[in-house]
Regions:
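C-terminal regulatory/oligomerization modules of transcriptional regulators
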Residues: 1, 109, 120-142
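Short capping segments at the starts of secondary-structure elements
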Residues: 44-48
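N-terminal leader segment of winged-helix/HTH proteins
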Residues: 1-28
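Pre-recognition alpha-helix immediately N-terminal to the DNA-recognition helix
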Residues: 20, 36-39, 98
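The alpha-helix within a helix-turn-helix
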Residues: 53
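Residues within helix-turn-helix
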Residues: 49-50, 61, 68, 88
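Short alpha-helical elements of helix-turn-helix
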Residues: 4-8, 28-39, 61
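Charged, amphipathic alpha-helical coiled-coil/dimerization segments
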Residues: 18, 68-125
Length: 142
């Protein structure tokens, strides 16, 4: 069976979502990468670069530069890691926490308006299908 049409639609759906989401994030005065970091660190305890990398959608090769630019803009501070002297912990500044408190709920509401165009049952089915599909590619030997 040729799954090319599934692959194309999956990619197009992601690209459509990314465009829709990114447009709003930019209207909020952030880049998508900045929003990802702020949304991940917002209302959370400080975390290491490794933890942040695991929880964001940012490639590991880009993360250091992104964080350094956000430190320079006054969005992130580094703290000593009491559990590992070789690493630092990252935390939002009060300035960035205010950005999170305003932008995160606004963006979630923006996305919710789009998802409300589909019935809850259909969204649940789609979520389950995507989880199954992800498992195929993240556990290919299973």
């Amino acid at each position: 069976m040729n799954n090319l049409s599934l692959i194309k639609e999956l990619v197009r759906a992601y690209q459509g979502f990314e465009t829709y989401s990114s447009t709003h994030i930019r209207e909020l005065g952030l880049t998508p990468v900045q929003f990802d970091v702020i949304a991940t660190l917002g209302n959370q305890p400080p975390m290491s670069y490794k933890q942040l990398g695991e929880k964001t959608l940012i490639s590991k090769s880009s993360l250091t530069g992104v964080v350094e630019r956000m430190i320079a803009k006054g969005f992130i501070v580094t703290l000593e890691n009491p559990d590992d002297a070789r690493s630092v912990l990252l935390k939002l500044t009060a300035k960035a926490q205010k950005v999170f408190d305003k932008s995160f709920p606004e963006h979630m509401a923006y996305l919710e308006r789009a998802f409300q165009k589909l019935p809850a049952k259909r969204l649940k089915e789609m979520t389950e299908s995507l989880i199954e599909l992800k498992a195929i590619f993240t556990n290919p030997r299973s």
